Structure formats: C-alpha cells, structure tokens
C-alpha cells in the first residue's frame, strides 16, 4: 500500500495490515475506487490512533485486532464528535449518520449538525467494525454488542467502545418449517376474506411511544430516529380501534385440521432478490420493476441509472404526468432507505418531507386496523415487516384452511407514498389518489406462501362454470 500522507506511523501501517477487504471490484473504475478507499481507511485509522495515544488505549486496540479476541477490554473514545475529531463545537454521537456513505468536505459539520470526516460521516463503531471485520456492513442495525462490553454504543455513555471484537453481526433467525397436510380437511365455516381495497384507511402518527415486540433490534436508534419505546397514547392513535382487530398469535379457537393426515414440512428460503418495487403516479404504473438484491437500498428522486443500491425515480418519464405529480416528485429528494436485516424490514425517511406507509404486518404488531396508514416524519425509521411474526401467523393459518393462508398474501405487500398522505384524515382517501407512491412485494414470504398453498391443494369453496 502506497503512503498517501506525509508520514504514516508504523502502528497505523500495522493496523491497516489487518483491514478486511471487500470482494473484488470489477470495471474500469475499480482501481481508482480502491485507491480512494485506501486513502479513507488510512485517514480514519490515523485519526483514531491519534486519539487513543492520549488515553493509553492504543495497545488494547492492537491486541484486540491482532488476536481477534472478544475477551479484550473496551477501547473507548469520547461519545462527542468534537472530542473524537478535535473540533471545538460539541456534537453528540447521537447525531452521527448511521451508514457513513455520504460524501462531504473533510472535517466539516453539515447543516443538520452531523459531522463529516475525510469525505464521509458515520457512527464510529460502525466505521471501525466495517474496516476491521465486515466490509459489507451497512448500518448499526446489523450490530449488537457482546454482553461484557461496558461502553457499547446502545448504552449511550459519555464514552463509546470502538473495539470491533466487542460487536457481533446480527444473524437472520432460522424460521421453523410449516407442517402442512397433503390434503387439508378444510373447516366447514371460515371467516370471509377481508377486503380493504375499497375501504378508507385510518391514519396514525409515527409510533414514537410504542414498545417493540421483537428483541432483534440490537441497539436503540439515536434520538433523531424516534424510537419505538413506551406505550401508545390516545393522541398518537388517530384511529378508532373498533373498526377492526389484528389477527392473534394465540392458538385458534376453531377446530384444527385432521392431524391423522400426512404432514409435510415446508421450509422458508431466502430469494436472490428480497423485494420487488413498483413505482406509480396516481393510478398509473411508471417504469420497470426494481429488484432489490442488496440488504440496504434507497428509493429517491435522483437520476443514477445503474446502482444496485438505489431505485432512482427521477429517471422515469410519464407523458400523462400532471403539475401536481411533477411538483411532488421535486420534493421526494433523498426519499426512503429500506433495510432488510436479521429477517426484519425497516423503512427510514431520508426526505425532508414525510413518507406514509401501509404495512399490514406493522399494523398488527401495534394493534391497529390492518389498512392503517402510518406517517413517518423525516429522520425517523420504523420496522415494517418481521419474518418471525409472519411465520407464526402462517403456522396458525394452516390450521384454518386454504383461504386463511391465501389471505396472508396481503401481508407481503407494503405501500408507501411520498410527500402526500392518504386515508380518512386526508383529502386523498386511496393510495391511487396520491401523486407518487411505491408498492413493495416481499419475495421471500410470498414464495413461502406459494409453496404452502401448493402443498395444501385446493380451497374449500369450489368454483364452477355456474358459480
């Protein structure tokens, strides 16, 4: 590695020798991109070494990296950005960006108060875990601290541990197979399939005070990401709960199928593309479907035509586009970031305007009507799907018959509008009345449903030429 600074201390060179390299980058620009990455890494390590020398923790960092041992001590730096990087204005770690992927001038502060260092910004533990352990790390959602880390990022102490071996990658939980009878004896009486397409959805504000139902969120997001702690207040839920009730995860009170039949396990498998996204303007589909292969992607209003981590709506043309749609498109901006991590899907509003989400899985978690539309303000994120919750529902629905399983297909579709909301509290009461919106199809759950339905056979209600 060629030296890119006037002087590179030996300890920096040693630490850089342990840097994990991402997979080979193809294309003509690969060499230039790798050179820029090496420059960034050297500056990041040199900045950290300079700070740790003052506190005497440098040896512990080198020990942790060279031995790759999680039993090493915490390697801490002050949790204020100003102390970390020598700036005079205090700027708490809570204001760091979660990814470190945006480009800005070196050692400057952005208008929103977050700090950029050497053309990038990010949470310090994410930066150094990416550098020394997981080059493909996207977000702090993918990390959880080990139990004996006293200064883990999620503890929000005055100092934060950046020992890369004090963090673990969040693993995707293995979903148990669903046991499906070869020929299901369907219940004689089943509840009718709910149809929400023609009803006016209710609205609710972002659930800032709701306790999450899953332990797979490894760390509390910074205050800028309004978290889901506490209990729901009446003011937050602008909806009437007597219009519908979520499906319960408790055992059904209906009689189950005949268990003397041959049960076949149907397993879940991850698809090559975890979701497909279609873009609409009012009731018209615009452009091609975007197939998401990366665990983190953004849907924005810009114009990059060939990035697997971005679905850029600014490229798409529509001869029927009216002035309202055109104006709305200009306000999409950075749009929404979608994460698929540990079997969970998160939506983060990056735009300066709110986004509006209709997720039946999320609505059930919070006890809302299945068609409720949730407003996510700028800078906030929300878990919009959970594979384990879906697996529990699927296992229960198999006992209720073909129609109950088929109804779960609606849970695998998530609708999201930009800038303009819809529902009972808005002038626009259907998603097809909003100027710009997208529809996500979650491919893994949909393919799992397909395999289960194929195994189950036919629905109980027969369809004849006379029906």
Swiss-Prot record:
InterPro entries, per the entry: Dwarfin (IPR013790), MAD_homology1_Dwarfin-type (IPR003619), MAD_homology_MH1 (IPR013019), SMAD-like_dom_sf (IPR017855), SMAD_dom_Dwarfin-type (IPR001132), SMAD_FHA_dom_sf (IPR008984), SMAD_MH1_sf (IPR036578)
Ranges of residues in domain MH2: 274-467
Alphabetic keyword roster: Acetylation, Cytoplasm, DNA-binding, Metal-binding, Nucleus, Phosphoprotein, Transcription, Transcription regulation, Ubl conjugation, Zinc
Gene3D superfamilies xref list: 2.60.200.10, SMAD MH1 domain (3.90.520.10)
Modified sites of kind Phosphoserine: 240, 245, 250, 255, 458, 460, 464-465, 467
Biased composition (Polar residues): 207-217, 233-243
N6-acetyllysine modified-residue sites: 19
Renumbered ranges of motif PY-motif: 221-225
An individual GO BP term: regulation of DNA-templated transcription
Domain of life: Eukaryota
Modification sites for N-acetylserine: 2
Keyword Disulfide bond: no
Processing after translation: In response to TGF-beta, phosphorylated on the C-terminal SXS motif by TGF-beta and activin type 1 receptor kinases, phosphorylation declines progressively in a KMT5A-dependent manner. Phosphorylation in this motif is required for interaction with a number of proteins including SMURF2, SNON and SMAD4 in response to TGF-beta. Dephosphorylated in this motif by PPM1A leading to disruption of the SMAD2/3-SMAD4 complex, nuclear export and termination of the TGF-beta signaling. In response to decorin, the naturally occurring inhibitor of TGF-beta signaling, phosphorylated on Ser-240 by CaMK2.
Residues at which Zn(2+) binds: 74, 149, 161, 166
Similarity remark: Belongs to the dwarfin/SMAD family.
Primary role: Receptor-regulated SMAD (R-SMAD) that is an intracellular signal transducer and transcriptional modulator activated by TGF-beta (transforming growth factor) and activin type 1 receptor kinases. Binds the TRE element in the promoter region of many genes that are regulated by TGF-beta and, on formation of the SMAD2/SMAD4 complex, activates transcription. Promotes TGFB1-mediated transcription of odontoblastic differentiation genes in dental papilla cells. Positively regulates PDPK1 kinase activity by stimulating its dissociation from the 14-3-3 protein YWHAQ which acts as a negative regulator.
Protein name: Mothers against decapentaplegic homolog 2
Organism expressing this protein natively: Mus musculus (Mouse)
């Amino acid at each position: 590695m060629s030296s890119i600074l006037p002087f590179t201390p030996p300890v920096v060179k040693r630490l850089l020798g342990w840097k994990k390299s991402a997979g080979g980058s193809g294309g003509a620009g690969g060499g230039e991109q790798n050179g820029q990455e090496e420059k960034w890494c050297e500056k990041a390590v040199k900045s950290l070494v300079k700070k740790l020398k003052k506190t005497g923790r440098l040896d512990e960092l080198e020990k942790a990296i060279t031995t790759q041992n999680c039993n090493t001590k915490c390697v801490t730096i002050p949790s204020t950005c100003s102390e970390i990087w020598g700036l005079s204005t205090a700027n708490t770690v809570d204001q760091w960006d979660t990814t470190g992927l945006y480009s800005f001038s070196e050692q400057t502060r952005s208008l929103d108060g977050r700090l950029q260092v050497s053309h990038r910004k990010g949470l310090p533990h994410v930066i150094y875990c990416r550098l020394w352990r997981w080059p493909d790390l996207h977000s702090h959602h993918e990390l959880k601290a080990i139990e004996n880390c006293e200064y883990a990022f999620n503890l929000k102490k005055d100092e934060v541990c950046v020992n890369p071996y004090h963090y673990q990658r969040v693993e995707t939980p293995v979903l148990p197979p669903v046991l499906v009878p070869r020929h299901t004896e369907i219940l004689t009486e089943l509840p009718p399939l709910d149809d929400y397409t023609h009803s006016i959805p209710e609205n609710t504000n972002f659930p800032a005070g709701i306790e999450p139902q899953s332990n797979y969120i490894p760390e509390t997001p910074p205050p800028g990401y309004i978290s889901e702690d506490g209990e729901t207040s009446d003011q937050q839920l602008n909806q009437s709960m007597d219009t519908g009730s979520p499906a319960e995860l408790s055992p059904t009170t209906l009689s189950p199928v005949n268990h003397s039949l041959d049960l076949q396990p149907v397993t879940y498998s991850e698809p090559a593309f975890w979701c497909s996204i279609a873009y609409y303007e009012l009731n018209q589909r615009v452009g091609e479907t975007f197939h998401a292969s990366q665990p983190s992607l953004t849907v924005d209003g810009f114009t990059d035509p060939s990035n697997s981590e971005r679905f850029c709506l600014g490229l798409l043309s529509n001869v029927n586009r009216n002035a309202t749609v055109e104006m709305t498109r200009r306000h999409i901006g950075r749009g929404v970031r979608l994460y698929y991590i540990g079997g969970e899907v998160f939506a983060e509003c990056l735009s300066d305007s709110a986004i509006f989400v209709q997720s039946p899985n999320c609505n059930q978690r919070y006890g809302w009507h299945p068609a409720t539309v949730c407003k996510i303000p700028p800078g906030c994120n929300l878990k919009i799907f959970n594979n384990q919750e879906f697996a529990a529902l699927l296992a229960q629905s198999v006992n209720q018959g073909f129609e109950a399983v088929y109804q779960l297909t609606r849970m695998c579709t998530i609708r999201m509008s930009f800038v303009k909301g819809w529902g009972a509290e808005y002038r626009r009461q259907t998603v097809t009345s909003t100027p710009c919106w997208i529809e996500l199809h979650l491919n893994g759950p949909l393919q799992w449903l397909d395999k289960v339905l194929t195994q189950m056979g036919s629905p109980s209600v027969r369809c004849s030429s006379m029906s």
